[in-house]
Regions:
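ATP-binding N-terminal substructure of ATP-dependent carboxylate-amine bond-forming enzymes
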Residues: 1-171, 175
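Short acidic, glycine/serine/threonine-rich loops at helix termini
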Residues: 44, 84, 152-155, 228-235, ...
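Short, flexible loop/turn elements at secondary-structure junctions
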Residues: 144-145, 223-225, 287-290, 301-305, ...
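Active-site nucleotide/adenylate-binding loops and adjacent lid/helix of ATP-dependent enzymes
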Residues: 166-282, 332-344
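Short acidic-glycine loop/turn motifs at beta-strand connectors
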Residues: 234-238, 303-308, 369-373
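A long amphipathic alpha-helix within ATP-dependent nucleotide-binding catalytic cores
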Residues: 269-293, 311, 323-378, 417-452
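Glycine-rich phosphate/pyrophosphate-binding beta-alpha loops
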Residues: 319-320, 383-397
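Peripheral (often C-terminal) accessory segments that flank ATP-dependent C-N-forming ligase machineries
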Residues: 405-524
Length: 524
């Protein structure tokens, strides 16, 4: 019954859909459930993960439409000053008018459970949400869609603007590889999904035999998040088991012994914990792409409920961790030498996902390796994984779109304001230093105001901050720096870092290195 009711609700959404822009201009109630409904043992590896519910606060900018009403639910109450900060960004809308159309609700539950589960466990809260929404004028958005979000959609009788959870597999590591193959998009050699360490070693040995030149293999939990579920298997220490020097059985045994020495991308991970997740989540192995000059671009797309593919953006991602596997931030747009190729591949992948029945946002991560060529610079692009959900590049781009009311130009891969001005940005979720710990949201607002670090609505340039709730405990902050040129965006980011360092230098006798580069990766 639940599945048929959910499909009926999604069909209603398809019937009412015209376009992304016109949909937001209608008289609508938007329910925002920013739940990271991911494996909680994996998400716990991310510092301040509970505050990632703030990443969808860009949705408040939708209140610029005077007919829109919005309900935003969080696990713990949001500081009022954070809400005020976003509402003050609205161009041409009186603050009080927007605030009257915003309803904030909370579960008052800081446990590791996902926010959606917390809501479902509180039937009175569910009923209050239901009463606040207007029938036939409402829809629900979320960070990622699972069976919990589907259940909440059905209980509220509100359509969910997200893929059916039955399609979740296509956003996993193994599912991504199958979509790449269907789309004829280049991707690294790798394995099918395995469920135990013995089969993992077997798959790694077979991959090594197919590619004897490999120096490293990536081991990925099938449902890892932001690269936190990735590990590196170094092959050099077991050189005696190389394909041309040993039997297959010898190679498998050598890899099995070496698995205990995987290099994990997060300091919290151990082989004992990682190996225990393989029977629960599954895992794959994949060839590690080497290269002297290597980048990590991505493309973001949107599948309308009618199945049309829209390319939203491209980015050059900034990755960290021992082997560059952890997402830290991004530049918009991606390098001009490959951004149009990213778009073409993104459309192919979007079409394959739409054929499976997926709707709403998807992102595709790539690895780009510079190739020597007599005619100039060329880049080899290999697709790595699909995110069938909102991701780290969603909120900065949507913030840019909502604040400037501009448009993405598919012919160039650039973003233009209504006045024809090109816009660029640098964004991160991981500006994190120990000396920032103890800063309260109010303190940050004082610093923003005093040093004029705010977003200027007249020039449509400046900084937009998020993850403010993670500052006090974790010293962690997110921001999007919008400029009229790549250099201006980079300068804005560097200015914020310089000011925060100076403002907090008296709080601590030392400053640790930020996990995000102190100077973003240079634009080409």
């Amino acid at each position: 019954m639940g599945n048929s009711k959910f499909r009926q609700l999604q069909n209603n959404l398809r019937d009412r859909w015209l376009s992304v822009d016109s949909f937001d201009q209608d008289d609508r109630d938007i329910l925002v459930v920013p739940s990271l409904t991911l494996d909680q043992r994996e998400i716990k590896k991310v510092d301040g993960f509970l505050h990632y519910e703030e990443r969808l606060l860009f949705s408040l900018i939708r209140l610029r439409n005077p007919h829109t009403r919005l309900i935003y639910i969080t696990a713990q109450p949001l500081p009022p000053i954070v809400i005020d900060y976003y509402l003050q960004l609205l161009p041409g809308i009186p603050f009080s008018h927007a605030r009257d159309r915003l309803l904030l609700m909370t579960t008052y539950d800081g446990s590791l459970k996902s926010l959606t589960q917390k809501i479902l466990e509180r039937p009175r809260l569910v009923e209050r949400i239901r009463r606040a929404l207007r029938p036939d004028k409402s829809y629900m958005v979320c960070y990622n869609s699972t069976y919990l979000e589907r259940e909440l959609s059905v209980q509220l009788d509100v359509p969910l603007l997200a893929p059916d959870p039955d399609l979740l597999y296509w956003g996993t590591k193994s599912g991504s590889r199958q979509i790449f193959q269907l789309s004829d998009v280049p991707h690294p050699d790798g394995s099918e999904l395995v469920w135990n360490c013995e089969d993992l070693a077997e798959a790694a040995a077979q991959l090594w035999e197919r590619q004897p030149q490999l120096r490293r293999i990536v081991v990925k939990l099938n449902e890892g998040f932001s690269g936190e579920g990735n590990a590196i298997l170094e092959l050099n220490p077991i050189a005696q088991a190389k394909p041309e020097q040993a039997s297959h059985a010898t190679r498998v045994r050598a890899i099995q012994q070496r698995l205990e020495h995987l290099r994990f991308q997060t300091t919290y991970e151990t082989w004992k914990n990682f190996s225990s997740r393989i029977p629960e989540l599954g895992a794959i192995v994949e060839a590690f792409i080497e290269g002297e000059e290597k980048r990590s671009p991505s493309v973001q797309g949107y599948i309308t409920p009618q199945g049309k593919i829209n390319i939203l953006s491209t980015h050059d991602q900034i990755l960290g961790g021992p082997d560059g596997q952890i997402y830290l931030g991004c530049h918009f747009p991606a390098d001009e030498t490959y951004r149009l190729t990213l778009q073409e591949m993104g459309i192919k992948i979007g079409q394959a996902l739409a054929a499976k029945g997926a709707i709403e946002r998807y992102g595709v991560d790539f690895v780009a390796v510079r190739q020597p060529h007599s005619s100039g610079v060329t880049w080899d692009l290999q697709a790595i994984e699909i995110n069938l959900r909102k991701g780290g590049t969603t909120h900065p781009f949507m913030t840019l779109k909502f604040l400037t009311n501009g448009r993405y130009d598919l012919s160039t891969g650039l973003f233009h304001t209504q006045q024809g001005k090109d816009k660029y940005y640098v964004a991160t979720d991981n500006l994190q230093k120990d000396c920032y710990r103890g800063l309260m949201p109010n303190d940050l607002m004082d610093i923003i105001a005093y040093h004029k670090l705010h977003f200027d609505s007249s020039t449509r340039t400046g900084n937009i901050f998020h993850l403010m709730g993670a500052l006090s405990e974790f010293g962690k902050l997110g921001l999007t720096c919008i400029g009229n040129s790549p250099q201006q965006a980079e300068n804005l980011y560097n200015q914020v870092v310089k000011v925060l360092d100076a403002e907090t230098s008296t709080q601590s006798n030392y400053t640790t290195e930020s996990s995000y580069p102190s100077t973003p990766i240079a634009w080409s």
